[in-house]
Structures are given as structure tokens and as C-alpha cells.
Amino acid sequence: MTLSMNLGADSYDIIIEHGALAKASEYLNLNRKVLIVTDSGVPAEYADTIAAQCKAPTKIVVPEGEDSKGFPTFELLCRTMLENGFTRTDAVVAVGGGVVGDLSGFASASYMRGIDFYNIPTTLLSEVDSSIGGKTAINLGGVKNIIGAFHQPKRVLIDPDVLKTLPPRQIANGLAEAIKMAATFDAELFSLLETEDILANLDTVIERSLMIKKSVVEQDEKESGLRRVLNFGHTIGHGIESYEDLHGLYHGECVALGMIPMSGGEVRERILAVLKKAGLPTDLHFDADRVYEAVTHDKKADGDQIHVIYAPEIGSFEMKKVSLAEFRQTIKEAFAQ
């Protein structure tokens, strides 16, 4: 299956195909210098399979986890390209999850003011969400994604077969982003997640999630309006991640927790049920004041107000700009339950 992201001069294809990794050179221009970036948690054969199809590959394996998404690793990537004589005609290929994609994308956006970038996601979270849309970033001072750029990939290659090596917790981590999109845009997908065997329907979950995000990004590439809806669960989720000092909980797990206060009544109960079915945490046992302090550093804060996304009904959303005082009370009430 091929989806086309229509962004004018920055348009690109999203290839979804079982076994695509072994024939990546049919879809990606690897006949040049290529920096392949992966991490220690990704099976080595994935990056090696790509390297074997490249004319002049250079491979970097960064440590697994959020600690790699910072300036030291970013500098390592840029310095490696510099020392190996990379020019604007060369490319970076990310083979990994969200951390690898964000880091590699930002390095490719920055080196020589931008070189080609290909994304080959190997986690469910990156396959359903972070591999498309052009957001690239690194962390600073415990704040997620505070330094970054919009830099669209030239192509995204999704091979669902790589998910077979993922542990159940990583599958659940990715499902959080699919639940987020279903809760705000696609009641039919949400119903599938509620009633069907999720693992048996992963291909459908991936395709439907990507179609939602593709449509949103095409309408609002730089997140000035509609794309903010994709932050459902992320404002409080990022606060929890920062509170946790980027350790302990995965990104999707934090997003799952962040969705709970942004819904109510029957909608909240349905979201809670799907989160539990997917194996995601639902216990808000954090210090509300510390989470709030972390949230005030969030990119969605605007002076003494903050942009928030609510799910009033499954498959719909409401964008609001509320005072920080009101938002603080929302957090306190949710975390007190």
C-alpha cells in the first residue's frame, strides 16, 4: 500500500509493505553516501540490511532511550557526516523508533541547512505516528522536543514484519498513539480497538492511523491549528515524562495517562477501557504540582494560557485555550481521583 503525503514541493510517499526492508533500494535512493542511524535496542540486522543495499554506507548505533536525544548525540551525527565528506546530495536514513527518527531528522535538517532524510520506523509508535509529518527534535534540560525543526522525509518505508520482534510493552506503547487518533478523529477505528483482537488487526490500525495523520498534516503542516489536535494527551503526557525525568515510563504510556483528564463521563470510561485492553497504564499516581510545573515549559503554553485538546465524544475533538490556573485545577482534580 502506498499513501501520498501531499505537501507541494515537500510531498512524499509512505510505503507500507511486508518484507519491504529487504528491497529498500527499490524505494529509496541509496546510490550515494548514506548515514544510517539506529539504536542498541533495534535488531542489528535491520540496519545491516539497509547498509548492504547502499553504495557508501556509514552506520551509527546510539544507545537506546531518550538520553540519546540530546546535543552530544546530535553533534556525533553531524560530526560524522562532516568527517566523511557528506554534501547536500547525500542522505540520512533512520532505522528505529521515535528517538532515532527525531534525532536523525533533526541532524539531516541541520547539516548544510538540510539534506535528504528517509525514515524506516521499527516500532509500532513510529509506524502509526512519528515517522510522518516532518517533526524533528532533541531534548534539553529535561524538556522534550524543545530544540527542533520541521523537515519532511523524502520517503517513509514501513515494514510491519519488524514488529514481530517487539515486546508486548512496546506494542502497547505504540497503540497509545493509535488510540489518541481514533478517540479524536475516527469512531470506527476506536470501535475496532474496543471490540476486535487488536494484534490481529495491526495492519488496519497502522493504515487508518497514518491516513488520519496524513490528512491532518496536509491541512496544517506547521501546527498552527488543526494539527494541534494530534497533541491530545501530549500536554499532560509531556509533563509526566519531564516529571519522570524522561525515565521509567515510555512516551506512549505517558500519552495514555495524559488522555484521561482530557475526557469525561462515558467517553473517559471508554478510553480507560481501551487503554487497559491495550496494556497501558491508567493510574495517575503523580504529584500534580510537579507535573503542572513541567507542563508550563511545554511548547503548547502561550503566556498565561495553554492550548488543550478535549475529546467530548469518541471520534471528535474540541480545541480550547484555557488559563494556566484553570488547567492546573484540571490536573489536580484528575490526579486526586
Task: Set out the residue ranges of the language-model regions.
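ATP/NTP phosphate-donor binding region
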Residues: 1-91
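Solvent-exposed alpha-helices and their adjacent loops that cap or buttress functional pockets
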Residues: 6, 85-87, 110-111, 139-140, ...
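C-terminal charged capping/lid subdomain of soluble metabolic enzymes
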Residues: 11, 176-178, 267-337
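A glycine/threonine-rich phosphate-anchoring loop and its flanking beta-alpha core
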Residues: 15, 21, 29, 106-196
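Residue-level signal for inorganic ion chemistry
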Residues: 17, 36, 70, 121, ...
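Phosphate-handling active-site elements
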Residues: 83-89, 112-119, 242-253, 268-269
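Short glycine/serine/threonine-rich phosphate/pyrophosphate-binding segments
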Residues: 99-106, 127, 238-239
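Active-site segments that bind and position negatively charged phosphate/pyrophosphate groups
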Residues: 192-290
